[in-house]
Swiss-Prot record:
NCBIfam families: PRK00110.1, PRK12378.1, YebC/PmpR family DNA-binding transcriptional regulator
Domain of life, per lineage: Bacteria
Subcellular localization: Cytoplasm
GO molecular function, one term: DNA binding
Protein name (record): Probable transcriptional regulatory protein HNE_0161
Record InterPro entries: Integrase-like_N (IPR017856), TACO1_YebC-like_2nd/3rd_dom (IPR048300), TACO1_YebC_N (IPR049083), Transcrip_reg_TACO1-like (IPR002876), Transcrip_reg_TACO1-like_dom3 (IPR026564), YebC-like (IPR029072)
C-alpha cells in the first residue's frame, strides 16, 4: 500500500516489514482471484484483472503467484465475493473508509466494527464519511519515468488532473471516469521503458484532520488492525500527521 503524497503518510504503518509484505502479497493475490472469477482470466478483456496484475507486478509479486491466483479464480466451486465499503470515525475525529472484498458479509462487518469499537472509533453508515473525500484515479510511476516536469507534461497531455512528484516517485491523479483513458495514454507515452508501480481508484481527502499524541497512537493501532483483516482490501483516512510525529510513531 505505497503512498508518499502529503495526505498519504497514513499508509506508512508501524510493524514488521516482512509481515506487512506477506499481508500485501496475499491481498493482491486475492484481488487477482476475485477479478479473474468476476470478469474472466484474460487481462486484455478484463480491466479489473489488468489493474490487479499491474499492482502485483509493481511490488514484485512472482509471476507464478499471479498465474496461480488467476487460475484459482477460474476453478469450479470457488467462493463468491462481494465488494463492500464501510465508513466510520476513528480517534481524534479522523474519517476512515474501509474497502472490503468478502465471501462472508457478516464476518467482515463484525470484524471491521470490532476494529473500530475496540480502538476508540465508531462505525457509521455509508456516506457518513465519504462526502469528505474525492474518489480519484491514482497512477504511480517510479522516478525512472522522468523528471517532475517531464511527467507533468505527459500527464497533462494524457488528460490527468494533478501530479505530485518527489524523490520516491510520481503520483498522477485523474477523474474517476478518465482513469482508464489516462492510464492507456500514459502507457503509450512511456512505452516499454517504464511501467506503473500501481494504478487504482482511491479515496483522497478533501480536508485533513490534524492528530498527534495518544490519539495518533490509537489511530495507528486501529489502522494496523484493519490492515491485517483478511476481508479488507484498502483503508483510507484523512489524518494529518507531522513528520516529527510520524518519526515518533515509527520509533525513529
Amino acid at each position: 500500500m505505497a503512498g508518499h503524497s502529503k495526505w498519504a503518510n497514513i499508509q506508512h504503518r508501524k510493524g514488521k516489514q516482512d509481515k506487512k509484505r506477506a499481508v500485501l502479497f496475499a491481498r493482491l493475490s486475492k484481488e487477482i482471484t476475485v477479478a479473474s472469477k468476476m470478469g474472466g482470466p484474460d487481462p486484455a478483456m478484463n480491466p479489473r484483472l489488468r489493474l490487479a496484475i499491474t499492482n502485483a507486478k509493481g511490488v514484485s509479486v512472482p509471476k507464478d503467484n499471479i498465474q496461480r491466483a488467476i487460475d484459482k479464480g477460474q476453478s469450479s466451486g470457488g467462493a463468491d465475493y462481494a465488494d463492500i465499503r464501510y465508513e466510520g470515525v476513528g480517534p481524534g475525529g479522523v474519517g476512515i473508509i474501509v474497502e472490503a472484498s468478502t465471501d462472508n458479509k457478516n464476518r467482515a462487518a463484525t470484524d471491521i466494527r470490532t476494529a473500530f469499537s475496540k480502538n476508540g472509533g465508531t462505525l457509521g453508515t455509508t456516506g457518513s464519511v465519504s462526502f469528505n473525500f474525492d474518489q480519484l484515479g491514482e497512477i504511480e510511476y517510479p522516478v525512472s519515468a522522468g523528471s517532475a516536469d517531464e511527467v507533468m507534461e505527459a500527464a497533462i497531455m494524457a488528460g490527468a488532473q494533478d501530479v505530485e512528484s518527489n524523490e520516491d516517485g510520481h503520483w498522477i491523479y485523474t477523474a474517476r471516469e478518465d482513469f482508464a483513458a489516462v492510464s492507456t495514454a500514459l502507457a503509450d507515452t512511456f512505452g516499454s521503458k517504464v511501467e506503473p508501480t500501481s494504478a487504482k481508484i482511491i479515496w483522497k481527502p478533501k480536508v485533513t484532520t490534524p492528530i498527534a499524541g495518544d490519539a495518533a497512537d490509537q489511530l495507528m493501532k486501529m489502522l494496523d488492525v484493519l490492515d491485517e483483516l483478511d476481508d479488507v482490501q484498502s483503508v483510507y483516512d484523512n489524518s494529518e500527521i507531522s513528520e516529527d510525529e510520524m518519526a515518533r510513531l515509527s520509533g525513529g
